[in-house]
Amino acid sequence: MPAEAMEATRQSPRFLWLYALAWAGGAIAYVPFLTILLPIRITAVAGTDNIRWLALITFSGAIAASVGNILFGWLSDRTGSRRGWIATGLALNVGLLLAMTVVVAPLALLGLILLWQLGLNMMLGPLSAWAGDCVPRVQMGLLGGLLAFAPAMGALAGVLITLPDLAGPNGRIMLVAALIVLCVAPALLFGRPLSVPVAVDPAAPVQARRPFIAMWLARLLVQIAEAALFAFLLIYFRSVQPGISEGFIARLFCVVLVAAVPIALAAGRWADRNRRPFLPLAIAAMLSGSGLVILSLSRSVDWAIGGYIVFGLATTVFLSLHSGQTLRVLPRSEHRGRDLGVFNLTNTVPSLIMPWLTLALVPSFGFACLFVLLALLAFTSATILSALPRT
């Protein structure tokens, strides 16, 4: 099909919105669970040994997630089916979440978490590849903007389940399970994507792999910074102002994620209209580094909040748009699920790197030194993206 015809053919807005809702369901599946519900559950079953078990479960879970995403993405490539894997992963994810309400031993909880991570990535791996099957290049910016709803929905779900008197510990897990089904099931039941031509590169020469590697590395560098702020945000703010509350930090985190949605949508649409897919990514990475520089220089809580807002908005926009534009640089369409699993390593590997990086720098040199290093990583990401071809 001629390039002009491919540019004129677009996926239906209905499918794009249903897909974005399903992707948000994926975020709801792990954000409130890993940040709120899992620590509570570990404390309930492990008592005073909760820190050691949380570290072990987090580390093991990251490895299981990395393996599972590649494995099930590859299997969905081989079978030529995405929906079946997504539906099976959804069922396993929900079932294993509910099973955690009856676990009473730390070792059993560890086993369930490993299985849950596999089930979660049985859903997420093929789900990410499904977008590559259905969304043409001309709409990848819009897709990335829509994906910005996912972290915001995950954060809002965390706020919802912690409302006073809404539900107990087990009830919160059940509520999360219900929200996942409500978000993912509509795409499986009613998502009927139009048959649109999706550009592919049949030979995948070495030149085609270079943008893939560049995009992978650029995301990894930004994700390391994001993972550090995600894990140590409260501790950092209390180093600036000791009396700051957990509730304030949670609200700040949520507001930033929600505010990033319209920015990501506007940037994604601009990238599509102007055929500049990588420019908004480079700008976002540069702004992310700028926010980290502000954080490194902050001596008051107001400056710290301002620096985090710049960093949080830019990073959320970057990660959302990057998820859409990644589909543009995959070398071979028949290995789309597997290759996206490789890209998913940029989401899990930082969780393995970041604790050691923080321990090496913060106790001796403070958070300012850590933020300077993270800013250099973000600026390097921007430089890498700036060197990519215009389209």
Placement of each model-derived feature along the sequence:
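Helix-loop boundary and gating motifs at the non-cytosolic
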Residues: A5-A62, I213-A218, V222-P242
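A late C-terminal transmembrane helix in Major Facilitator Superfamily
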Residues: E334-P363
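Loop-to-transmembrane helix entry/capping segments in MFS-fold secondary transporters
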Residues: D49-R52, R137-L146, E246-G247, P331-F343
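Helix-to-loop junctions at the C-terminal end of transmembrane segments
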Residues: G68-S81, I263-R276, V362
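Intracellular juxtamembrane helix-capping segments at the cytosolic ends
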Residues: L38, M122-V135, V317-P331
